[in-house]
């Protein structure tokens, strides 16, 4: 089973951050209701200081984890947060990311409160940092902060294909003898000591869907 749930709606936003904001019981009713993608500061068309959108701010999302999530892998993905992000679930730090131009994912399966409300808190630092691209040299565009791309949750089986990399290998200067190499990463978010056997069958097809090759399982 695999299902994707987009998490663009239902976020709370505050232009400041304090450590108590990560706590589940923190009252955010008076915060601004926002939808992703979102920028931490609305700016006029001209005549404004670039420091106006450089800040440490906070996003919070309340969500219910149903019983059917109990035996599944639950992964939350942010497509882009500018420029540093710290993520907390129910007051506990679960991950961080340092780049506004790359996506990142966090497995929250074992930290969820099943059958209850959960609170995801994101501390966003949009200030310039010379250690994070594109800062460190001259740039000719504005580097707005915030959760400025989409967010979503993927529901997967406890054991799932995490990544597949298919590439060819052709020896240089030799008679054409190409190899097709398939690298597959399998993850198990269930019991770590549980042994499982898998059979993976891969096929290659042309755009016309004509079958070309079935790769061996070894």
Over which residues does each language-model region extend?
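Accessory beta-strand-rich segments of carbohydrate-active enzymes
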Residues: 3-17, 39, 54-163, 189
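Extended low-complexity, serine/threonine- and proline-enriched intrinsically disordered segments
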Residues: 9, 87-89, 197-208
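Surface-exposed, low-complexity/disordered Ser/Thr/Gly/Pro/Asn-rich loops and linkers
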Residues: 46-50
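Short beta-strand segments of immunoglobulin-like
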Residues: 165-173
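Contiguous beta-strand segments within globular domains
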Residues: 173-185
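A short beta-turn/strand-edge loop motif at beta-sheet boundaries
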Residues: 189-198
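Conserved small/polar residues in nucleotide/adenosyl-binding loops
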Residues: 210-217
């Amino acid at each position: 089973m695999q299902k994707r749930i987009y998490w663009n709606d239902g976020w709370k936003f505050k232009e400041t951050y304090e450590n108590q904001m990560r706590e589940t019981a923190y009252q955010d009713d008076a915060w601004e209701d926002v939808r992703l993608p979102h920028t931490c500061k609305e700016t006029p068309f001209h005549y404004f200081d670039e420091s106006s959108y450089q800040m440490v701010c906070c996003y919070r999302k309340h969500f219910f984890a149903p019983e059917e999530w109990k035996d599944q892998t639950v992964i939350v993905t942010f497509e882009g947060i500018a420029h540093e992000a710290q993520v907390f679930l129910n007051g506990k730090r679960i991950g961080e990311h340092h780049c506004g131009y790359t996506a990142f994912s966090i497995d929250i399966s074992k930290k969820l409160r099943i059958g209850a409300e959960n609170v995801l808190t994101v501390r966003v630092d949009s200030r310039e940092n010379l250690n994070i691209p594109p800062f460190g040299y001259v740039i000719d565009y504005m580097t707005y902060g915030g959760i400025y791309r989409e967010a979503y949750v993927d529901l997967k089986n406890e054991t799932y294909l995490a990544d597949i990399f298919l590439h060819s290998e052709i020896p240089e200067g030799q008679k054409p003898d190409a190899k097709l190499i398939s690298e597959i990463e399998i993850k198990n978010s269930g019991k770590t000591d549980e042994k499982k056997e898998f059979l993976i069958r891969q096929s290659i097809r042309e755009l016309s869907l004509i079958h070309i090759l079935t790769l061996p399982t070894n």
